Amino acid sequence: MLRFIAVFALVNCALAGTLPNDLDGRIVNGVDTTIEAHPYQVPLQNAALSHFCGGSIISEDLVVTAAHCMQSYTASQIKVRLGSTIYNEGGELVSVKAFKFHEGYNPKTMVNDVALIKLATPVRESSKIRYIRLADRTPPTGTPAVVTGWGTKCFLTCVSLPKTLQEVEVDIVDQKACASNEFKYGSQIQDTMVCAYALKKDACQGDSGGPLVANNQLVGIVSWGSGCARVGYPGVFCDVPSVRSWIEKTAKEL
């Protein structure tokens, strides 16, 4: 069911599967951008400093990501790089003190796919590091949005991983519309989800945990989908307004 597994892509991404150990970031048909344009974006890196997921910084020591990103790691195995357009160099590399994923996260249905990371060292805002506000309501269908992450500029045929941050423009598809007959997911789209869609553009293969931003607010967290940039299958995100109260509560506990 997770969208970010290369072998799924080779078999047209059947909507079933197990969680991968590493999730390498991909944006389909995106363009180069800079961290100054998206200073809330961060890459999560494992002990070998390999990129495995994205995230969004929301305060001096808190990063929001996807629950499914965190299943194979302990806090000591994760580092967060902030303030760099290049995923594996520059900026500030910060250790993780603790993290928690949503108690209601279900890897089969992908509901509540959200986690909160507490950094070991607080970071200050700058031109390259900015905290992003959590949206308190889901924008209506058709609202322009942007997804960012690190990865190939095309689907399957690109073998190299660009070091430069990528962005792709999409349109919001709210939960009701995404579950309608206009698209092909049906009842798989649940209340804690929001979708985004643009022809031949998408997040894919491990931009998991990264931001979906509209109106300068964090609207969604990259979660899952059927393949990447497939006609009739929007990208599916954890709906931030639906889990905002959990994020705020957990922020006080970490």
Curated annotation (Swiss-Prot):
Catalytic activity: Preferential cleavage: Arg-|-Xaa, Lys-|-Xaa
Annotated GO MF terms: serine-type endopeptidase activity
Cellular component terms (Gene Ontology): extracellular region
Feature type site, description Required for specificity: D202
Catalytic-site annotation from UniProt: H68, D113, S208
Keyword set, alphabetical order: Digestion, Disulfide bond, Hydrolase, Protease, Secreted, Serine protease, Signal, Zymogen
EC number of the protein: 3.4.21.4
Endpoints of the signal sequence: 1-16
S-S pairs: C53-C69, C154-C158, C178-C195, C204-C228
Chief localization: secreted
All residue ranges annotated as the Peptidase S1 domain in the record: 27-252
Catalytic class of the enzyme: hydrolase
Location of the protein in the cell: Secreted, Extracellular space
Role summary: Involved in digestion of a protein meal.
Alphabetized PANTHER family for the sequence: AT20289P-RELATED, POLYSERASE-RELATED
Family: Belongs to the peptidase S1 family.
Protein name as annotated: Trypsin
Taxonomic lineage from the root: Eukaryota, Metazoa, Ecdysozoa, Arthropoda, Hexapoda
